[in-house]
Amino acid sequence: MANDYLFTSESVSEGHPDKVADQISDAILDAILEQDKYSRVAAETLCNTGLVVLAGEITTTANIDYIQIARDTIKRIGYDNTDYGIDYKGCAVLVAYDKQSPDIAQGVDRAHDDNLDQGAGDQGLMFGYACDETPELMPLPIYLSHRLVERQASLRRDGRLQWLRPDAKSQVTVRYVDGKPHSIDTVVLSTQHAPDIELPALREAVIEEIIKPTLPADLIKGDIKFLVNPTGRFVIGGPQGDCGLTGRKIIVDTYGGAAPHGGGAFSGKDPSKVDRSAAYAGRYVAKNIVAAGLASRALIQVSYAIGVAEPTSVMVNTFGTGRVSDAVITKLVREHFDLRPKGIIKMLDLLRPIYEKTAAYGHFGREEPEFSWEATDKALALAEAAGVEPTARVA
């Protein structure tokens, strides 16, 4: 009997209030790194109706206009009218940054030399994951959820659906048979809209213009349940509808619940914070394992102690799909990847102003030129060392 089950993931648009906060935090991080790549940044953002609060810890030589960066980010997202929930021109922006605690800094302040034994900025555990469900080696439900809200934003920006507004959420339920995607079961899409659009017209346009062009044709089997703005009216949105906070969409940012999460958010954090850099490294490791043909699914856990460079643990789980044992793969990971914090920064070239782009539509599974953790440049070496044939996805 086939193992038949449903699995669901969600995403949110760049105009969702929590994502507004994430993008402001990462825009500030990028501006700082452009001037001082060795800065220590933990930039948190709160946004509500007409108000943005910037707080956290920043130690830098950079001279940054934080208020203008916040306004520019809100404008780029599309909040240029008070009717949308916040207006970049008129919102209040409060700045309350402190410097990094010297107790923390003493363990990580070797950033300017070539010593790769810079300690981790905190303790913690991080996960990386990859699977062969999509060419990008991502779980299908989160991949499709991201593409839906990306398309919503695209149609809003180019004016094809002029009544769309920045805030939106998506959710995709996929039916799996024997562990493989079989068909799309349910698609939910809720989008903020202008007050004068009638609900039937909105639903028809969303289904025909956003949802159907996004779904893979080979997974459209039978009747799919389309739930578009299922509560009806969605005029009040963005930071007016809900208070936005940095770091509240950590499952959207990663694998949509298909893999565990260590709990640490990404946005606003410089790469000395292993919450971010080690999660990126975990994705890099897992993706190369799958691309190498060592397994069709790979989960990596890595953990750290504050002030200590070497990971306290490295674990690989291939869920029985490995062509060699998990112990062998773990040994290969330790041999081919430097998972010390500064080793990760060097390996993935993370001292660059590349982070605002990560803050909406997922940190993983997007083959952007800046996203070094999506490369599969270690796959051939892993395959050769393990004695297996790599997949066709090696790049």
From Swiss-Prot:
Its EC number is 2.5.1.6. Its main location: cytoplasm. Pathway: Amino-acid biosynthesis; S-adenosyl-L-methionine biosynthesis; S-adenosyl-L-methionine from L-methionine: step 1/1. InterPro entries: ADOMET_SYNTHASE_CS, S-AdoMet_synt_C, S-AdoMet_synt_central, S-AdoMet_synt_N, S-AdoMet_synthetase, S-AdoMet_synthetase_sfam. Residues 100-110 are annotated as: Flexible loop. L-methionine binds at E57, Q100, D242, K273. Its cofactor is Mg(2+); K(+). Binds 2 divalent ions per subunit. Binds 1 potassium ion per subunit. One of its GO terms (biological process) is one-carbon metabolic process. One of its GO terms (molecular function) is ATP binding. NCBIfam families: metK. Catalyzes the formation of S-adenosylmethionine (AdoMet) from methionine and ATP. The overall synthetic reaction is composed of two sequential steps, AdoMet formation and the subsequent tripolyphosphate hydrolysis which occurs prior to release of AdoMet from the enzyme. Belongs to the AdoMet synthase family. This is S-adenosylmethionine synthase. The gene is metK.
